[in-house]
């Protein structure tokens, strides 16, 4: 889970379609061996989380490190990136590109079983 740290006064706006492109570009930047190792996960975008409006991204599922031999037939894990809080966190599209990439890395890391403490130690918190 990634949360913002307060909005900015100069509100950036990008369309939902453009935001989807930025997320797709960030996913394309994941090294091929890691992308191939992502198992049973879907990446979605939404305007905002209904209960936590400052949430930038959210991983929901069973991390690869916690899956057992009987893990089968489950619905895909979900990584959701939230457009509105990410826009409010950024002053321009270049900053948004960076924050989308950081958020994608953060949530994909959770899929691989990397927790927030380890992400902070690695500089991705």
Regions found by a protein language model. Give the residues of each.
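Active-site rim/adjacent substrate-binding subdomains
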Residues: 1-99, 111, 117-120
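Short alpha-helical catalytic segment bearing the HExxH-like zincin motif
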Residues: 99-107
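Short hydrophobic/aromatic patches at helix-to-coil boundaries
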Residues: 121-125
């Amino acid at each position: 889970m990634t949360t913002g740290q307060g909005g900015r006064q100069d509100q950036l706006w990008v369309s939902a379609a453009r935001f989807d492109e930025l997320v797709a570009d960030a996913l394309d930047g994941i090294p091929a061996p890691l992308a191939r190792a992502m198992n049973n996960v879907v990446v979605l975008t939404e305007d905002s989380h209904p209960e936590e409006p400052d949430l930038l991204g959210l991983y929901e599922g069973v991390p690869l490190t916690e899956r057992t031999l009987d893990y089968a037939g489950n619905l895909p894990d979900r990584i959701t990136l939230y457009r509105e809080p990410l826009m409010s966190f950024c002053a321009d599209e270049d900053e948004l590109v960076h924050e989308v990439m950081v958020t994608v890395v953060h949530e994909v890391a959770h899929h691989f079983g990397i927790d927030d403490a380890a992400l902070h130690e690695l500089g991705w918190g």
